[in-house]
């Protein structure tokens, strides 16, 4: 009798194992094959963009150039070339981390945001994420060098609320789950 119970336990265990394997295998076979999950991400950082509209060949601007390592004169051309490269690469996501502007000049943020929006229109489905850096908000060094008398003046600084409004096309996107 013991042999029969032992054989019955073996048979029951084998039957349960077959049922278990079958029930787990069928859904796995019926599931869709995994999609190609390649995600192309472009990252840009420390743009230090300075609008050409704020540049004038004055003594104050020359002093600023000689006092700073940022490529103020070249920043617009560099940014243009980088955006052309992004257009050619057609990434799914563009992450632009601060410092976005020279020193948080609101006019520079507005000009950059306009270019980013154009880039987003040129690349269907492109998600753009923008993160401010220490140069981008409440910076007292914001300057405009293109003045009537050739003297640099304080440019309009960007406050956190301004930043969010300027880059509204980013922060109104429901995929952005947290802001400031």
Across the structure, where does each feature detected by a protein language model lie?
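Extended active-site neighborhood of metal-dependent phosphoesterases/phosphodiesterases
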Residues: 111-180
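Bacterial N-terminal signal peptides that target proteins for export
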Residues: 2-15
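N-terminal active-site segment of His-dependent metallophosphoesterases
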Residues: 30-109
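Residue-level detector of short, conserved catalytic/binding motifs and their immediate flanks
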Residues: 18, 39-42, 126
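Active-site micro-motifs of SAM-dependent methyltransferase domains
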Residues: 22, 49, 102, 136-137
């Amino acid at each position: 009798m013991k042999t029969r119970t032992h054989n019955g336990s073996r048979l029951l265990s084998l039957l349960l194992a077959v049922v278990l394997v079958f029930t787990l295998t069928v859904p796995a076979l019926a599931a869709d094959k995994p999609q190609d999950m390649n995600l192309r991400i472009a990252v840009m950082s420390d743009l230090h963009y300075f609008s050409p509209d704020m540049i004038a060949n004055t003594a104050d601007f020359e002093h600023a150039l000689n006092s700073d390592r940022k490529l103020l004169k070249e920043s617009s051309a560099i940014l243009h070339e980088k955006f052309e490269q992004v257009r050619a690469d057609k990434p799914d996501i563009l992450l632009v981390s601060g410092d976005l502007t020279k020193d948080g000049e609101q006019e520079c943020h507005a000009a950059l945001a306009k270019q980013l929006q154009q880039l987003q229109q040129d690349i269907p489905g492109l998600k753009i994420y923008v993160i401010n850096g220490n140069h981008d908000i409440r910076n007292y060094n914001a300057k405009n060098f293109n003045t009537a008398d050739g003297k640099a003046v304080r440019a309009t600084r960007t406050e956190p609320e301004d930043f969010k409004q300027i880059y509204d096309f980013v922060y109104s996107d429901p995929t952005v789950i947290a802001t400031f």
